[in-house]
Amino acid sequence: MSYENFIGKQEKFTENINEKQVQKIVATLQSKQLKNGDALPYLWQWCFFNEALTPDKLGRDGHPKLGLDKNSFFPSFGEVNRMWAGGRFNFIAPLIIGEDATKITTIKKIQEKQGKSGKLTFVTLEHCYYQKEQLKIEEEQDILYKQPAPPKLTSDVVAMNADYSEKMQPDSTLLFRYSALTFNGHKIHYDFPYATQVEGYHSLVIHGPLLATYMINCFVKNHPDKQIINYSYRGMHALCVPDSFAVESKIIDNNTAEVWINKNGFVAHSGTIHFK
């Protein structure tokens, strides 16, 4: 199928980086207190710029329906499951709390592949974040749409020895609160019967962007003097509550660090950070 008419389509969102919303993120992630005028921490922009759709515009999984009408941003890919596969960031300057910001989203690429479980459709979105007409953050997000199949829950990539390691065990309350912060209706994060009986997970699924946030936070907490220039990350398999895991990091050279989620000695999610 040709998706040529969708390539280059754009959406624009303008929102205040509201201090009250920031305080909710602080409470959820147990982070340090922040106020108006402070820099928004890395990846917290995901808790802003999220479209408020009415229930009739949502699909069976709680995500926006695809190809709803001729004006839809996304085409229809049929009866598919959605996964946040990974992404890349260039950090030019931080967003500032208390100021208005604009996000412009562009469909950059739609690519079909054949996988072991059937057809895979990869969508790459570009998100550009601005304040006072200055580009602050460039992001590329990879979304995977796949035919219903048992989810991958293991990895054969052995975790390396880490410089820093922090044990974590998210619970369902944390998942619910993060879903609320990001206005994410995906049922795999809060609807146990749907997650287990429809999509085949053994429990509620931990958000990919939350895990990406944990990984970058691991580096920031242990290297607060370093400025991150860019960050790439990807998920290798899903993690569910109440699974415990370690968030780990290791500096590889003068301006590169690897970060990952260690689940029983194997890598579940991974990322690369370039810093100065």
State where each predicted segment sits.
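Hydrophobic, proline/glycine-rich low-complexity stretches
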Residues: 1-100
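HotDog/MaoC-like acyl-thioester-processing domains
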Residues: 1-10, 84-170, 238-276
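Residue-level preference for alpha-helix termini and adjacent loops
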Residues: 5, 16, 45-48, 81-83, ...
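Catalytic-pocket segment enriched in acidic/His residues
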Residues: 195-252, 258-272
